[in-house]
Amino acid sequence: MAISTSLLIVALLIKLCLVNTAPPISKCFQDGILIAELKSSSGISEFCIKDDISILKSEITYSKNDTGIFMHSKVFRHWTVADWKQCNHTSAGGSTNVLEVDKNLNLVAKNYMCTRPCVITIDKENAQLLFQTEQLNQFEVTGTTISTGWFKSKTSVSLDNTCEHIKVTCGKKSLQFHACFKQHMSCVRFLHRSVLPGYMASSICQNIELIIIIILTLAIFIFMCIITRTYICYLMLPLFAPIAYLYGWLYNRSCKKCICCGLAYHPFTNCGSYCVCGSRFETSDRMRLHRESGLCQGFKSLRVARSLCKSKGSSLVISILTAMLILSFITPLEAMTTNYPDDKKFTLKEVNDIVLGRDMEQELKSSILILMSICGIGIILIFFGLTVLLEIVLELIAKRSTIFCKECNLIHDKKSMTYRGDFTNKCGFCPCGELEDPEGLVIHTTRKSCTYYIKIRNLKLIMLIFSIVILMQNATMLVVAGENCWTNTEIKADCVGPLIGPSACTNKGSKTYKTVAQELVTASKITQLDADKYVLLGDTIESALDAITSQKHYSAMHLLETMFLMKHCDYYKVYEHNSGYSQTKWRLIAIANSFDICTNTPTPNFCKCLSDSSCSTTTLNFATSMNATYTSKVEFFNHDFTLFLDIFEAAFPGSATAFLFKKIKEKNPYQAFEMMGKIANKYPNNKLLVVILKYGQYMVGLSHASTYQLKQEWVAKSLSLTRAQRTGLKMSMANAEPGPATKECSDAKTIACLTPKFQVEVNNLMSCGASPNFKIYVKTGELYKAHDRNSVWCLNDMHCLTPYTPANAEIITTMKKMDCWQDNPKQPTDEYAIPKRSCQMKDRGLCNSGADKWKIIKCDNHKLFYTDALERRDPASIVGSNHCFSEKCQIERYPINPTSLTNCEWLYRAVRPEYIKKLSLQTIEEYKKAIADKLTHTLQLYHFAPLLENLPHIKPTYKYITAQGTYTADGIEGASITTSIPALSGTSVGFKINAKDGTDLLDIVVYIKASVVKSIYNHIYDTGPTININSKHDELCTGQCPKKIPADPNWLTFSQERTSRWGCEEFGCLAINTGCVYGSCQDVIRTETKVYRKANEETVMLTVCITYPGHTFCTDVNAHEPKITDELELQFKTIDIKSLPNLVAVTNHKLYTGQINDLGTFGQMCGNVQKTNTSHTGAGTPKFDYTCYSASRKDIIIRRCYNNNYDSCRLLNQESDLLFDDNHETLVVYNNKRLNGELALKLLLGDIQYKLYTENMELELEAKCVGCVGCFESYQCNLQITSSLDETALYLVPVSHFHDRIQIKTTKKDYAMKISCTRDPGDKASFRVCGKSYDFNFHTVPKNDKIEVNVGDETSYIKEKDNRCGRWLCRVRDEGLSVIFEPLNNFFGNYLNMFLYILGGIILLFLALYILMPMCARLRDELKRNERLHQMEMKKR
């Protein structure tokens, strides 16, 4: 029995060993490549995640030693696209998402792009994008069409949207363009995806409007036929009754009667059996007798109306009219959304600025009406007063400073005048300088102008005195602090802010901190270095007060406070009253809080005065009502004294608060008693302020005040008693001088100097060389030891590429008056001091370093390194994308500061999209060669230079307009036309310009090429869905969780206590209902969406093209200022601008708007996880679970870290009307589909001598036309015309042309025009010009382009077609005529026209015989009857 038991135990042990040694089951995938591992006391969570090229997983094992439990974490990768490295990828940004692992095993999502060469072309006939490469590459199409994939040779992507706004990327090439089909493609896509082939779907959709109106007509007709079989049809009696009545009236009045039946004449039919009254007769004679005898009751219109209600013909007519009526009302609608700002809540610190701003706004609003009403009168009175008073004052001064000499009858100036008996030393001389003729022929007489010189001299004196008075007034502002306050080295009670504030404030708001600082420099109160500190005050009141209170020394605080009070001279002036913007903050604190002493019974008079401003401040009796309470209850004193200090700090920020805190900190609070008393005496009318200050005087006199402990933040605001010192050796700079230009510095020292009076620090200086002849430079960056010499220091990096900036003589002169210290520079330990052998390359290129060209690699962390092995990859890199800096990565190199390099030419700049290139060809032969070379084009646009693209695709509608100007015997001088045109892209209008006598002059086409509202947007962050969560966690066997859980920046922390229990604890932990699991986490997102913020206000830009025959030009005009040139004048008549959104999101090259978080805000909407550069930010409460194991650590499962509402980004509104140019970090967003107003234009035509023109003249004309039939470009024609006379030529062509008349000049030979052909004109076509026939040579390129490519801001053919013919009936008219007649016309040619003319003649003849003949016969009989009556009347006479 014992043996069997022993055998059983051995068997169980062997089985247990076999189980323990069995290979573990691998999660996610088997094997894989180990890419990173780490041993640490905190572990990561297990994950299995896939990116675009691989799958990653993590494995964690635990080990324990004497120091604790450690986690061994490993990360493995399994390739799904094994050969993706062949595309020569780089992390310059792209569409390939790759997850990498940093040194802490955190997942980092990066985007890579391939750099293999790729050729992008477009097949316009098949509407396909073509990609071609030699090795593995990746393409991506985003925008209205989305497609991506890998390929090795050729591939294509079909375009099927009506208008495509797409971004195409292949390899390192990226293009952005706009393309539109000839027709709307939504219908074609719908039908083509069914059983219909493509050409049939295109034909149906080309005539879809006609098909729809026919189907609707048939549907209505069938419905009408059904109701005609019921009595419901008589509901249409009100419709047909008026028609029947009108027909009956015309029947009786207008038609000749048949001699057989008495009814209306009917030449083509027999006499009927029914009379118009409804009676039936067997013979026509009885009917005639019935009509002639007067028994017929007349035409029964209701009978005819009832017949029409039952008639199928009338039903068909009603069906056609109803269908046309219904479809004529189908037009697009446009709406506008207005966003109203949400209410804003202000903090207590902002309240001063808000109240001041609102007070100023209210004051402005209340006084603007008064200012407007007295403005005109005031200006008149001022000028009148100056004129009158100045003249009077100058006249009085002139009389007092001059005398009239009776001896010489002249005026003399009293200045420097002496008497010589009855004469003076100035006799014979007049102040005006005019001399008498010695011969006595010209005698000078005294005039008023003789005193002008004296008046001007006195006027200069008055202006000088006035200027001095103004300067003295401004200078008095500088003395507000008293002379002793500027010389004090420590704060005193008389030199605090409320006591040194200016007593007068007459120029409120007229000064800036900069002007105030310069006034202090002028008054020799401070140096220029002190004055430059005004920038610390900022732009608002709170920023200035924060700058003042943050100073640690009295001199600096006094300086800034003086500047502040000189600018805001009324800050303490309003304390003379019981309200004001500067009192809002401390009064809010006093009202919102309560003193503990006020809870006692009876209530002290002090508490009553806090709520009643009419109480007397002489009956407060603090000692009587408060001593007992504060003596027994120290906590009451501490609370109330703290509240008093809060109020005092809000009321008197700056030096007054600093003085009080300083005395409390020194345990001498009673020394502040005098300061508070002086402040109370200065503002006796401010009752609440006086009460609080007297309360403060009482409180500082109590014994508890000496033991009161200031809060830490208040201790920091108390002034320091000692002057600042600097580390290093104090040195004399008496022999210092500016250093020479150099890039290297030996014996480098950093210099720190302090101004002797205000201790303004100057620490951006350094010296080179030995003592005492220091060479001084401005320290513009960090100092590094050269990487190859320890005694040499470099600027900004370790390569000595940046030159030092010598200090100027003014700075050195100032230094010699300061106390300066020298210290040895410290070698930084930042990224520029860390060498590397390789890195993940983001870009590469050549940069200028002085006169040399350096080969540079830009790493994924934006650091730049010199390299001489650009194509060498580091075999030890994880992803295989690290590039060596030297052969085989043997040499370590240091980063180069970007400021040391210039004119960098990067090879991978193509990650930023390029745009369509436009080429203007000067000759018709070049244009012919360009469009005929091949059908598959690169993305380039070719234009014939004389026409460019300044004409619309469709011939515009012409209007007649009369030229304005001066009409002469030869024609018009200064001819011009004035008109207006809607500011809408694609709008065009033609003008046939006539003279007043009706003479045709010339044709002009005005074309709005682009009318856009645009704005620039800056990229602020990326967002996307969460694909993984990085985490670090640890656990404690016993105890509580740490109060501060360690976490990296932007990581969220989580914790849970009482996690240890039986069966759920690590090995060796015997605990129940205690312990803790804690850690931190951060989301890893796939960046799918970029968010941009508007950087400037919207601008309206309009491009207007004017095309004369043979001359064309375009000009731009904005909405704010007119455009005036020698050829035209443009100005917006009306402006209607729709604001662009403030925030936009771009996903797959599509623009979205809606509820989007701004940078730094994390609301529950799109964009609450934000990636900026390499950091992720977000907010939320992590949710996590853990899995228990016996005698082992727990597995942490992070359910959620950040709140990521990326799903709401998919619900944003796509802005199909907004287009944009993607410039990587910026967007140019524009709307070219909106009517932006009305543009008034005046075209200046110059002189037109049309009366000298002749009708018929001989021309030497040679014409060549190149183009295609029915394509976007039409035919471009070049005309070579030689004429001996100026002429306006009328040309007649057998095709559609954009101009009927051209103006021929003797000085010009080349002309250009555009014509459209619906069929091939052949090699030659006959044109008539000036009455003569000429042959035009044509070259037709066989093209069937389905798609038109442009840059997006210009209008396309389909948009111009929609603008021209946007309603259903217009489309039906065009499509119906083209469907019926175009195939016949192509087959029969001119014979079809002959047939149509004959058919039209037959129809007119039929109408004449059937309708006009009876009416004419009736008219003839009526005329004969009147003739017979006239003859009978004549016989009776």
From Swiss-Prot:
Q: InterPro entries per the record?
A: Bunya_G1 (IPR005167), Bunya_G2 (IPR005168), Bunya_nonstruc_pro_NSm (IPR026400), M_poly_OrthobunV (IPR014413)
Question: Which Pfam families would you find in this protein's record?
Answer: Bunya_G1, Bunya_G2
Listed A to Z, the keywords are: Fusion of virus membrane with host endosomal membrane, Fusion of virus membrane with host membrane, Glycoprotein, Host endoplasmic reticulum, Host Golgi apparatus, Host membrane, Host-virus interaction, Membrane, Signal, Transmembrane, Transmembrane helix, Viral attachment to host cell, Viral penetration into host cytoplasm, Virion, Virus entry into host cell
Which residue numbers mark the site Cleavage? A481, G482
Ranges of the Cytoplasmic topological domain: 229-312, 395-460, 1413-1437
Q: Where are the transmembrane segments?
A: 208-228, 313-333, 374-394, 461-481, 1392-1412
Record topology, Lumenal segments: 22-207, 334-373, 482-1391
Residues with attached carbohydrate:
N65, N88, N627, N1173
Origin superkingdom: Viruses
Q: Does the keyword Secreted apply?
A: no
In the record, biological process GO terms are:
fusion of virus membrane with host endosome membrane; symbiont entry into host cell; symbiont-mediated perturbation of host process; virion attachment to host cell
Q: What kind of modification does the protein receive after translation?
A: Specific enzymatic cleavages in vivo yield mature proteins including nonstructural protein NSm, Glycoprotein C, and Glycoprotein N.
Quick one: a GO cellular component term? membrane
Q: Which residues form the signal peptide?
A: 1-21
- Function summary: Glycoprotein C and Glycoprotein N interact with each other and are present at the surface of the virion. They are able to attach the virion to a cell receptor and to promote fusion of membranes after endocytosis of the virion.
Q: Its quaternary structure?
A: Glycoprotein C and Glycoprotein N interact with each other.
| Family membership | Belongs to the orthobunyavirus envelope glycoprotein family.
Name of the protein in its database record: Envelopment polyprotein
